[in-house]
Amino acid sequence: MSQSNSHGQSNLAKFAFNIYGTLSTNSSTPQSHEISPSSSLSSSRSKKQTSQYNTQDTNNNRLSYYCDKEIISLSQLNCSLSIGGYSGDLQHHVVIGGKNYLRLLCVSESQQRIISGINLLESKSIYNSRAPNKLINVNTIKTFADTIATGLSNGVVSIYKISPNGQSKVTGKYSDHNRTINSLDFIESENQLLSGSQDGTIKLWDLRSSSTKPVMTVQANLHSDPIRACQYSPHSAVRNKICVLSVHDSGALCKFDLRTKSGGKVYSPEKKWNLHTGPALSLHIHPEKELVVTGGRDKRISIFNYGERQSRNTPQNLINTYGPVVKVRWSTYTNTEETAEEFEENKQAKPNTLYNYDIACSYLNDDPTITIYNLGRKFIPKQIIHSKKPIQNFIWARNETRSRKIWTISKSSTFSSYNLDRLEDSDVSRPIEDLNNIAMTWNNNNDFCAVSQARYDYDLETYENGINETTEENFDAERNYSLGNEELIHSQANSLTASPVDKPQLTRSLTFNPASSFSTFSPVLVARAATGFLQNDSATSSSSIPNMQVSSSRPKLTRNTSQTTQDSSSSQFASVLPPPSASQTYSSPQYKKNNPPRFMNNPAYVIPVSIPIPANDEYVFRKLSSESLVSTPDGFTLVDVCLLNASVAASVGNNRTSQIWRLLAVSIQEEFESGIEPRRIYAFQPEAINKLPQDVQETSTNANDTLHAETTNSNFVESFKSTSTSGSQFGKQSDKDERKLQSKNSSGNLMDMINKANRTNSFSATSFKFKEQERKEDESQKAQSIKDENERASIHSKSAPISISSHPEDLDDENMGSNNSAALKFSPPSVGVSIPSTRIISSSLASSPKSVRGPSGVKSHISRSRPSPPVQTWLKQKNLEVSNGSAMASTSGLSLTLKRNKTNEEGDQLTKAWKFKSLLRKSLDYATLQGDIIFCSTAALLFYDIVPEIISQFECLEWLGIYIEVLQRKRLFVNAINVIKCATADIQEKLQKLYCQDLSLRFYCSNCQALLVNEKSKFSGKGEFGYWYCDECSKLQSQCVYCNEPCKGLAVTVGLKCGHHGHFGCLKEWFIEDQNTECPGGCGYQII
């Protein structure tokens, strides 16, 4: 409990020091701690603690060291030390600092093993005091030769000297800052030191002086703008200047000249640039040029030229990262050495020094990665270091082999070393290796572009360098050679003939390459004859062409011939240059060995393709996305919404989508509103066949017997038609006549029902689940009664004689389809004896045999005449087989089809295939395959809350996410917000996190182009603060064209052509009250 309290008090103390600083600032002596004057090497207690808490891991040749306390700062000491018991000469060492922790780790020559650890807090010190030891928080460390400078959280600067034998002592302590020291840097030697603090000041210390006061104090503004990092620029010394750069919490980069005549204090920088919208947290100066890299909380890395001759106020290069950047560093060594493995085509150092050095950065928010970028391809990280714990700090390490090594410390108090040149390190990923050489994407106009680029062919030289190296004679020789090829092609055009079967492949004749207009020409067409390439000898190779760079052209882009290009005359032309073979590609070592190196690398080329797709019409998309209902308005039901969406789809010609919406509306109304219980189709009962009659009656005199004969005959004929969907009719003859009349006036199919859907009986979305639950409860209660009724009907039908009509069927009946549909809707299922489809029965009234598979519905006429002898013979034989048990009667085709769709073979119930849920699922599956994102998203918004078992949450989020992205890409922001508003609560919460984020707007001065921060006015409190003026140039940004007063807040623009704007009230008075039609600015622009 006491340990947790002490830990919380230490965190509170650090937080208080960062905000308020020390309470007493008059004391010139340090008050942080007291160090006993005992040697660190001779202390046995230090060695015991080192062996007890510190361990090192050399697995996979990686240096690792665990510290027993929290560490936050890291640096490298480059001086020669001789440690007792070790014969080697140690040059590079690690300095780690943290809470009550400051240790020097002596590393071996190979940097794979730690030889010794020196506790610098136990160094000899001349600053003795009787005060007890207090909290020491080493926030930053900087080294120069054998000197180590540390910046503490209480504003004290401590200086340590390391002797050649490894002993250390404190040589000075300076305290003039009020808050935490964030940055330290030496100026050309170990005698002058810069310190930047959270109190907004930069102080220059002379370490040779006995005074503990700074030589100079520099401040960016009169108010306190905390300094996150500062560094001395060695490139400005040639102009007799002491240039210092600093970054602040305001996001500004300031440049100071310490050789000023203003005395010991400077309150304004020489130059100031606003590079970041949020706090700038780190900076580092380029090793060779006047370039500085800065990183900030706005997730950006800026590369800026701070030289005297530059006049721009914006960064020269900008890298967008995936997190707030807390530390950014240029690499120590160039990339020339490592190009032999990764970048095989670049054997020489590139003339642009920006590409010779990599940039590494770490992130806030407990991110466990360090990303390495190169400006040659700044959009894709070159390498990423993955750690198990969040990265606290890192540096580029110097070493004897000049390899690219990074030293890191993590929040788990672990020091680690990573060699970026080792391919075996699993913790260092290379994203470029996981990418394809060819990529494509769609734009808003339904066109797409394909980009092709070599994997490591990214570090492009400047166009000017390529032009200077290529002389005019080379261009003339290449141009003459190209013209000669064209004449040869035209001369061979008449002699070249190709068969319709073997046509030469079409090749890419021109691609969009920005560098082609400067140094190279388009690749020459390469075509093949009927059996292959044109016969060319080696004399036509690049060796016979004077001063021609063959490798400067990219490989050809071919495609297979199509039917539309068989007669193309352009495909008959051929080139005299054959393409490289598969064994000699542009990336193979053999090809590079036999050809001279290129003077300029091939940039990526873009292939734009425009394909007019009718389904992606812009007007159709806007119409459907704007007018389709995604929610149920007041007074409407789901049926009404479906019908309205159907009309919207029909208005733009999407007839299939329109019919799907109508089908859903009818299925909803029929299944859940009509009050008729859904019918169930039961499995065939084999035991019912045992009760079939053994003989067949010829006629019947009773009216009821006649009715039964008609019914049985209908079932018998329907069983003949295995592929038909019709059935028999039960009821009176008057009912049959009435239905017969209805079938003449209407087709009776499902589409007529859809077109005549009634809204009066529609239901609301809230009653959907209740009615569905009520229907399911009634199903189980009436299942047994329906089953008994079917059994009675099946048994009763076999007690009556069967009469076969001798009247021929009307196969050309126009109402045949409608009768079948009506029969399916109103007739219960029946059991009959099916005759094989190959049997042909002769009719007594027909001159030719007719197939028994003719349609027989409500229009079928059943005769009481005697059936024909073949039929009677077959029936007797069939009944005899059934009665003897030698054969079982087969079920009808409809029954077989329904039985195949059953999930249980034990006779379970079968539901209708046109149920609402089934139709909805099938419609969504089809729309997903077709890419109809509008239908999927609209259906998800309407039915997700009602039928969650049909539409999963993952599908709903995926469809709506893609739909919102498409809407935003097409600038339909109102429709996108409406989609988010109409989603359910759980879906809406997740969509808002992704697509409803706050925007950060950056405003620049219209006169000096500086970023409008107005820090002076913000803290001075004079006047009304805003962004309608600029502190840098002291000019107003916009004035009303009518009253000539500043436009604070909302302003109305007269027209985009003239650009004049003013207050809303002023322009209302000018145009509406005074009824003027011209712009009040006098430009003559007419608004009407």
Swiss-Prot record:
<comment type="function">
    <text>May be involved in a process influencing telomere capping.</text>
</comment>
<keyword id="KW-0677">Repeat</keyword>
<dbReference type="InterPro" id="IPR049566">
    <property type="entry name" value="WDR59_RTC1-like_RING_Znf"/>
</dbReference>
<dbReference type="Pfam" id="PF00400">
    <property type="entry name" value="WD40"/>
</dbReference>
<feature type="repeat" description="WD 4">
    <location>
        <begin position="275"/>
        <end position="314"/>
    </location>
</feature>
<keyword id="KW-0853">WD repeat</keyword>
<feature type="repeat" description="WD 5">
    <location>
        <begin position="367"/>
        <end position="417"/>
    </location>
</feature>
<dbReference type="InterPro" id="IPR037590">
    <property type="entry name" value="WDR24"/>
</dbReference>
<feature type="repeat" description="WD 3">
    <location>
        <begin position="222"/>
        <end position="266"/>
    </location>
</feature>
<keyword id="KW-0863">Zinc-finger</keyword>
<feature type="zinc finger region" description="RING-type; degenerate">
    <location>
        <begin position="1040"/>
        <end position="1083"/>
    </location>
</feature>
<dbReference type="InterPro" id="IPR015943">
    <property type="entry name" value="WD40/YVTN_repeat-like_dom_sf"/>
</dbReference>
<feature type="region of interest" description="Disordered">
    <location>
        <begin position="537"/>
        <end position="597"/>
    </location>
</feature>
<feature type="compositionally biased region" description="Low complexity">
    <location>
        <begin position="27"/>
        <end position="44"/>
    </location>
</feature>
<feature type="region of interest" description="Disordered">
    <location>
        <begin position="764"/>
        <end position="829"/>
    </location>
</feature>
<dbReference type="GO" id="GO:0016239">
    <property type="term" value="P:positive regulation of macroautophagy"/>
</dbReference>
<dbReference type="InterPro" id="IPR019775">
    <property type="entry name" value="WD40_repeat_CS"/>
</dbReference>
<dbReference type="GO" id="GO:0005829">
    <property type="term" value="C:cytosol"/>
</dbReference>
<dbReference type="InterPro" id="IPR001841">
    <property type="entry name" value="Znf_RING"/>
</dbReference>
<feature type="region of interest" description="Disordered">
    <location>
        <begin position="844"/>
        <end position="871"/>
    </location>
</feature>
<feature type="compositionally biased region" description="Basic and acidic residues">
    <location>
        <begin position="769"/>
        <end position="794"/>
    </location>
</feature>
<feature type="compositionally biased region" description="Polar residues">
    <location>
        <begin position="796"/>
        <end position="806"/>
    </location>
</feature>
<feature type="compositionally biased region" description="Polar residues">
    <location>
        <begin position="582"/>
        <end position="593"/>
    </location>
</feature>
<feature type="repeat" description="WD 8">
    <location>
        <begin position="631"/>
        <end position="671"/>
    </location>
</feature>
<feature type="compositionally biased region" description="Polar residues">
    <location>
        <begin position="709"/>
        <end position="732"/>
    </location>
</feature>
<dbReference type="GO" id="GO:0061700">
    <property type="term" value="C:GATOR2 complex"/>
</dbReference>
<feature type="repeat" description="WD 6">
    <location>
        <begin position="432"/>
        <end position="473"/>
    </location>
</feature>
<dbReference type="InterPro" id="IPR036322">
    <property type="entry name" value="WD40_repeat_dom_sf"/>
</dbReference>
<keyword id="KW-0479">Metal-binding</keyword>
<comment type="similarity">
    <text>Belongs to the WD repeat RTC1 family.</text>
</comment>
<dbReference type="GO" id="GO:1904263">
    <property type="term" value="P:positive regulation of TORC1 signaling"/>
</dbReference>
<dbReference type="InterPro" id="IPR001680">
    <property type="entry name" value="WD40_rpt"/>
</dbReference>
<feature type="repeat" description="WD 7">
    <location>
        <begin position="502"/>
        <end position="546"/>
    </location>
</feature>
<feature type="compositionally biased region" description="Low complexity">
    <location>
        <begin position="561"/>
        <end position="572"/>
    </location>
</feature>
<dbReference type="GO" id="GO:0008270">
    <property type="term" value="F:zinc ion binding"/>
</dbReference>
<feature type="region of interest" description="Disordered">
    <location>
        <begin position="26"/>
        <end position="56"/>
    </location>
</feature>
<dbReference type="GO" id="GO:0005774">
    <property type="term" value="C:vacuolar membrane"/>
</dbReference>
<dbReference type="Pfam" id="PF17120">
    <property type="entry name" value="zf-RING_16"/>
</dbReference>
<keyword id="KW-0862">Zinc</keyword>
<protein>
    <recommendedName>
        <fullName>Restriction of telomere capping protein 1</fullName>
    </recommendedName>
</protein>
<feature type="repeat" description="WD 2">
    <location>
        <begin position="176"/>
        <end position="215"/>
    </location>
</feature>
<feature type="repeat" description="WD 1">
    <location>
        <begin position="131"/>
        <end position="170"/>
    </location>
</feature>
